[in-house]
Amino acid sequence: KKNRGINDYKENTAYRYDAANALGDIEISDTWKNFIKYHTSYEFTSELYDIFLESIKQIYKVDKDKLPNKNNTGVRFKDNAFFNTDCQFVINTPTSGDTSVIEPHLDNPKEFYAALFYMRDKEDTSTGGSLTTHKFIGEPSFYGKARVREEKVNLIEEIEYKENRLAVFLNSPLSIHGVTKRSKTDFYRKYMNIIGEFNNELFDFRPFLEK
């Protein structure tokens, strides 16, 4: 198989292939390229604006006319626009035991939205790998790169890693999420990571880092 920048293969680790590279890759089918083109387009972003408009108004205090438009939206690592989108192929490698891909955390503060399209193999009978959402028990508290300790949050919901399932959320200072531990498996955890981000940060979690 073609090595797409992966030089150090590790167990239960995420590896990504972004839209800018995939769209120029002759080994990627036209079907997938069309999928990527649509999910990095302003048309898709505009649909998300409409779906989440009330939440956007509540969290960010702006209406749709103040959000990025077709003229200033581009593809990340390709266009360097005011607002950049991406649609990444992502795999989490097989695991030999109960391990977690990532604990509760916040995404990049530049990110405005994220959509996870799960592509679980039909033959994959392993457990875990589900998306979790969380709420702080008290005041926000982070360590490292926007990580959150398990004892600082309560579980809100567990969204099963399932074939053809799409999970979408707005990124905010309270959008804490993680992934449940995966049991031993030879299967990859596969999904498309669809995001939109600004060139600037939307919030700052650093004042809440552990001292």
Label each PLM-derived region with a short phrase.
Residues 29-37, 45-208:
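Catalytic core of non-heme Fe(II) oxygenases with the double-stranded beta-helix
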Residues 1-40:
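Non-heme Fe(II)-dependent double-stranded beta-helix
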